Structure formats: C-alpha cells, structure tokens
Regions:
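Short helix-loop capping/hinge segments that flank enzyme active sites or metal/cofactor-binding pockets
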Residues: 61-70, 124-180, 194-229, 258-260, ...
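Alpha-helix-centered segments that form part of catalytic cores
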Residues: 228-254
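Flexible, acidic loop-helix segments that line cofactor/substrate-binding pockets
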Residues: 44-50, 64, 70-73, 105-120, ...
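Short, gly/Ser/Thr-rich active-site loops of penicillin-recognizing serine hydrolases
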Residues: 163, 283-304
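Short, well-ordered beta-strand elements
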Residues: 21, 267-276, 283-284
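Acyltransferase
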Residues: 82-107, 130-140, 165, 169-187
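A short helix-breaking turn/cap at a secondary-structure junction
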Residues: 1-89, 294-303
Length: 304
C-alpha cells in the first residue's frame, strides 16, 4: 500500500511482495519510510500517508504500550531454537523495565495451511511472470533455463486451478481477521522472534538430491502432487524462517530489531515487531526506545 508500484504491474504477487530496506539506524528506517511512501491512483492497495514531520523528528513512545509476545512456533513441527526464545525474552525484559505492559500469548494461528496457500500463489504468479518469455521465444522454459525451484513453481503454476488461487487469497484475508480478533483489539504491538534459528551456512544444502530428481520431473505429476513436492522442497528453509510470510500475506507492517547474538555461533538473532495496518509510527517509536537505550547490537564499524 505505501510503496510505489508499477508501471508494469501494481499488485505484485497480490500485494504479498514489496520492496524494503536494510537500515543500520531507526533514523534511516524512518527516513526510508517517509521518502518512499506514496499514493498511486492505479495501485489497488492503498495506505494512508504517515506524518512526515513525526517521522523526521521521531521520539520515543509518549504512552505506555500494551505489547503481546509469543514464544510459540507459528507452524506445527517447526521448533524454535533457544536463541530465538532468548532474543524475545531479552526484549521483553527491557520493555518491562521501561514500563510497558507485556503479556505472553499463544501464537494466534497454526500457519501450516497458510504456507501451503502461499506456495500455490507463488506457483501461479511464477507461471504468469514467465509466460511472456515463453510466448516471445515460442517455446516452453525447461529445467536447464532457470533455477530448479523456479522451474518447479512454473510447472505447478501451469496446472493451478483458478478456484484454488481464489481460495488462497480468501485465506490470507481470513488470517488477517484472526489477528485482529486475537491481537489488535487488545494490544498495540506483537513481538516474536524474527527467525526460528540462526542463519544456515553459505552453501548448506536445503533440498535433498532425491527430491531434486522429483522436481526435475514435476511436469509429469498432477497439481496436488506437484504442490506436495514443492512444499517438501521449501521445508528446510521454512525451518529457519516461519514468520515473515505471515505478515506479508496479511498486510501487517513488521520490523526486525537486532537485539541478540547466539552464544555458540556468534550469529545475530532478531526480534520482530508486528503491528496492525498503519501502525508504522508506533513501531518506529518503540524501535527508537530500543536504540536509545543501547539494545540494538550492530557491527563495530557501524558504531564508530
């Protein structure tokens, strides 16, 4: 809603994909939000413009906030690491010290079905994205032309039923309604880990060789089997990052704060602030409170 789109398309992945920025300060994040926000007549998703004066002269929250947090996994059979939990606990301890009301709750949904719907959208959108290339070159793309998962999504997208795609979009909206009912009616913000565990090693295999063979042959299967294989292919990566797609699909703003470092690997672990639509200013104000009290952990060269 708040980011410029077009001119080749205004509903990128039905609103589930939008550009962002990796920033090293809350000031820079607020500046990015301020300068990038816009209203476009052609854009189907609209968000009201935030107050630029408040963004440029950001202050800590002027009132005590009521913040929910959860140490539960959003997806069954995907556990959270102790580092992920410790990052949230550290943030919770700080928030309580600052006088905010912090309440532990269960994660409001089991997002297993939602991620399957997300893959269905990925498949249909990938097919739509690559179809012009196939028409221009008068041939179908094959597994030698593009990366394997993209090829798998392309083949599944060609068989995706229209009804399945519509049902997927409906489920996104129903999930947003659940968040409203279980969180936003009672709390200002929601706090979770950013990821379930620290990042994988560069080059760490996330798809088995046996599964890769199945993906190469994906065009030979029906849509149901195709989606089962695609879900299996994404499962290892989902074990690292089971949160972020949820806010993407529901349209809720989210902000990751680098507050913790894993003792064993010395890799960063973030906590993620979630807010209801148009709550970016509140999120940035709270992020500033973390920053002003030296809770954000940054590399030394950013601090000198």
């Amino acid at each position: 809603g708040g980011r410029p789109q077009g001119p080749n398309g205004y509903r990128s992945w039905q609103g589930a994909s939008v550009g962002g920025a990796l920033c090293i300060s809350v000031r820079d994040t607020a500046k990015f939000v301020s300068e990038m926000q816009t209203i476009q007549e052609a854009a189907p998703y609209q968000a009201k413009l935030l107050d630029q004066e408040k963004l440029s002269a950001l202050t800590e929250p002027k009132k005590r906030l009521k913040i929910a947090f959860s140490l539960g996994s959003p997806i069954d059979q995907i556990p959270l690491s102790e580092s992920a939990k410790n990052a949230v606990k550290k943030a919770v301890q700080f928030l309580k010290k600052q006088g905010h009301e912090v309440v532990e709750i269960d994660f409001p949904i089991n997002a297993r079905q939602l991620i399957l719907r997300y893959y269905e959208m990925n498949a249909a959108e990938t097919a739509a994205m690559l179809e012009p290339w196939e028409k221009a070159h008068q041939r179908a793309l094959n597994s030698d032309d593009i990366e394997l998962l993209s090829y798998a999504l392309l083949e599944a997208g060609k068989k995706a039923p229209v009804t399945s795609y519509i049902q997927a979009l409906d489920e996104w909206d129903q999930t947003a309604a659940i968040f409203d009912e279980k969180i936003w009616r009672d709390y200002d913000l929601f706090l979770t880990p950013t990821t379930a565990k620290t990042a994988p090693k560069i080059g760490e295999p996330l798809i088995s060789d046996a599964l890769k063979k199945e993906l190469y042959a994906l065009k030979n299967y029906d849509f149901k089997k195709q989606m089962q294989l695609i879900a299996a292919a994404f499962e290892r990566s989902l074990e690292f990052s089971p949160y972020n797609f949820i806010s993407n699909l529901t349209g809720q703003p989210a902000l990751s704060l680098p507050v913790y470092v894993d003792d064993a690997t010395h890799l960063p672990m973030g906590t993620q602030l979630w807010g209801k639509k148009n709550s970016e200013l509140t999120m940035l104000e709270l992020a500033l409170e973390f920053e002003n009290h030296h809770q954000l952990i940054l590399p030394d060269y950013y601090q000198n």
